[in-house]
């Protein structure tokens, strides 16, 4: 698994990033890194316009693989074109951890695929998900 020092998502400047699953346990440093990369403020899940990419914070107690599939479908529907989605989960062997296989299964069921994985900060892992055509 690659490491992203400081949370480099690979977002381009000016992109609108929609955030799903925000709670008090998210890594503010990662959020700030995404905002620094784009030069824009993250928009929440109630944002009513199209976004370029998305960040999904997902924990074990947020639901099962079907719930994650539904959320990925919703996130993809809000994207302009085939934007990327980062699914961030607590690291393995920590409270709320989600097996990477669950994220991969949810992505496949949603018609997407996991393209890479990375260590995202001290407490989170990230799986980059994109549409199959990408």
Predicted regions, residues:
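S-adenosyl-L-methionine-dependent methyltransferase catalytic core, i.e., the SAM/SAH-binding region
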Residues: 1-134
């Amino acid at each position: 698994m690659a490491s992203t020092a400081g949370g480099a998502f690979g977002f381009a400047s000016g992109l609108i990033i929609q955030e799903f699953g925000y709670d008090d346990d998210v890594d503010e440093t990662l959020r700030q890194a995404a905002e620094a990369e784009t030069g824009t403020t993250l928009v929440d899940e109630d944002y009513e316009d199209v976004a370029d990419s998305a960040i999904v914070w997902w924990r074990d107690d947020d639901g099962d693989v079907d719930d994650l599939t539904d959320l990925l479908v919703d996130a993809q529907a809000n994207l302009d074109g085939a934007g990327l989605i980062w699914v961030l989960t607590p690291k393995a062997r920590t409270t709320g951890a989600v097996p990477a296989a669950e994220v991969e299964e949810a992505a496949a069921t949603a018609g997407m695929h996991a393209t890479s994985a990375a260590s995202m900060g001290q407490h989170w892992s990230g799986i980059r998900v994109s549409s199959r055509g990408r």
